[in-house]
Amino acid sequence: MTNGNGATPEAAPPPQLNVLAQYIKDLSFENPNAPQSLAPQGQPPQINIQINVGANALAETEYEVTLTIEGKAESGSQVMFSFELVYGGVFRLVNVPQEHLSPMLLIECPRLLFPFAREIVANSVRDGGFPPLMLDPVDFVSLYRQNMERQAAAQGVQGRPS
């Protein structure tokens, strides 16, 4: 196929995603009841995990994406351990249409960061005297949708007259 002057139209360049850096931005592990918490317990602790994703622009095509993972293990009323990890990455996104930018930053980039963050959590918990905590894979698509629904609901509440 040619355009009016006989030249073939150039295809749009494909989107590019590059990881420029990965790093621990914040890491905290607490074992407040050691050494008693390290003794064998009657039943496994209840472990609650919270995961959040954020992104902000650094330059025209560079973005920082942060993956925050917080967790707490409790046995009855006793806290066995708690942790917080903020793991960051700097990404370059080129030729990404504006409508795809948010999903790339909040789904694809965290998906690339997660295995490294998971290993840091497992090692931190192990180094705290407990068996390594192997986090289950995260469905970042569902997390993205939940956050979008929450934002839409919050905007709906703000937009309503009192």
Swiss-Prot record:
The keyword Nucleotide-binding does not apply. It is found in: Cytoplasm. GO terms for biological process: protein folding; protein tetramerization; protein transport. The keyword Protein transport applies. One of its GO terms (molecular function) is unfolded protein binding. GO terms for cellular component: cytoplasm. Its main location: cytoplasm. Pfam families: SecB. It comes from the Bacteria. Keywords: Chaperone, Cytoplasm, Protein transport, Translocation, Transport. Belongs to the SecB family. Homotetramer, a dimer of dimers. One homotetramer interacts with 1 SecA dimer. One of the proteins required for the normal export of preproteins out of the cell cytoplasm. It is a molecular chaperone that binds to a subset of precursor proteins, maintaining them in a translocation-competent state. It also specifically binds to its receptor SecA. NCBIfam families: PRK05751.1-3 (NF004392), secB (TIGR00809). This is Protein-export protein SecB. The gene is secB.
